[in-house]
From Swiss-Prot:
Disulfide bonds: none
Induction: Expression is induced under hypoxic conditions.
Domain of life: Eukaryota
Disruption phenotype: Results in significant reduction of pseurotin production.
Top EC group: hydrolase
Family stated for the protein in its record: Belongs to the AB hydrolase superfamily. FUS2 hydrolase family.
The encoding gene: psoB
Record lineage: Eukaryota, Fungi, Dikarya, Ascomycota, Pezizomycotina
Functional description taken from the UniProt entry: Alpha/beta hydrolase; part of the gene cluster that mediates the biosynthesis of pseurotin A, a competitive inhibitor of chitin synthase and an inducer of nerve-cell proliferation. The PKS-NRPS hybrid synthetase psoA is responsible for the biosynthesis of azaspirene, one of the first intermediates having the 1-oxa-7-azaspiro[4,4]-non-2-ene-4,6-dione core of pseurotin, via condensation of one acetyl-CoA, 4 malonyl-CoA, and a L-phenylalanine molecule. The dual-functional monooxygenase/methyltransferase psoF seems to be involved in the addition of the C3 methyl group onto the pseurotin scaffold.
Record's protein name: Alpha/beta hydrolase psoB
Listed InterPro entries: AB_hydrolase_1, AB_hydrolase_fold, FrsA_esterase
EC numbers for this chain: 3.7.1.-
Active-site residues (renumbered): 246
Amino acid sequence: MATIHKLFKSPFFDFEFLRLLAMAPYEGAEIGEVLEAAAKIKDQDPESWYSTLLETGGKAEAIAKQAEASGDRVGARRAYLRSSNYLRAAQFMLNEGPIGHDERVLPTLERAIANFRKGVQYRDGKTIFLEIPYEGGKTLPGYLYLPPAARRIPGRKIPILLNSGGGDSTQEEIYFVNPAYGPDLGYAVLTFEGPGQGIVLRRDKLPMRPDWESVTGPVLDHLFDLATRHPELELDLDHIAVTGASMGGYFALRAAADPRIKACVSVDGFYSLSSFVGGRMPGPLFNGFMSGWLSDWMFNGILGVLKKLAFQARWEFNHLRWATGSTTDADVMRSFGAYTLQKADGTEYLADVKCPTLVTGAGASFYFDPATTTDKIYDCLTSLQDGVDKEKWIATDVAYGGLQAKIGAFGYSAQKTFEWLDQRFGIQREPLAASSRLEDLVSRL
């Protein structure tokens, strides 16, 4: 297995910084800006992480405004998008205390979103901002990215990829994976933020829910309503796929049982959240609590000591408190049991998935072991035939998708995703043959 250069000694800071850097190919970062920031950030110091990336985001924002003033659409788009990404990353490490305790988080994220919304308006294709009706009179924010007219697939309506976020992503971050890729192939990509994610968590304080089909159901309802009210969009409601990475891979599988979904790509998802946490926590601590041997106060006390010693553990449990709406770490642990693909009666939820499904794994992940995640998910898709309508791809090298959520290999992951969807949706493309001959170039005009 190939190794890569480390920018930070701690695996957590290194992984999260690589996550930011990985978006450079799709205008989510500028290499010089990012490397300059890396030199200023102190390892495992969330304050230096925040202040440095806030400064970097502000500089990119100023560049975007300068490009706007001079009428440079490309420059404005690029600078606004990477400014948004830097600001999104800046607030990422600030999660001490309950939601709202750190008053820098929400305004920083809102600024990131505002810059993102400016940037995507300078895309070649249209971006439709969505307000998706949800339970209790709430709405969920979403984006529908349409392909440019010149990129439409000849002779057919526009196929759609529904891209769910994960456990700690924002939908603006998700843009740099599939929405930045799919429209150039003629696909529309729809992203949204559900409870426990992004601005819906930090502003509206809606906790996450394990039955994600109750979230994607209203999203699909809204998509169908939009397509009906605006037939001029030519959205192909008979060819809708769903995808997501990491926890988003779990969410995608929950959504895939909906008959309106015709294909699913679950990228590095998990079968159960408890098994994931069990692999990340000292065995005696995890097993002691889950068996009832350790009381809440004992578990909270022991974990409190571990969190003081390890920033990653502190960050992860702080975030999980936010996302699950829990007040203690013991409450967080109890909430995990509901996040599983096994039904309460012991049967498999995945048996209800009838659409073709691609399941991926990450062999170099420090979060999941493909043997207990990817393989188990694949085997539980019992309504699908091996190698016919279910497939498995486990990457090992970091450069080609070996890290969790395909961090560092977004381009290759997107290529594999849309190539597989083309096959499932019957989309045939002519092989390409690059040529610099003047006659060939003129004939294409």
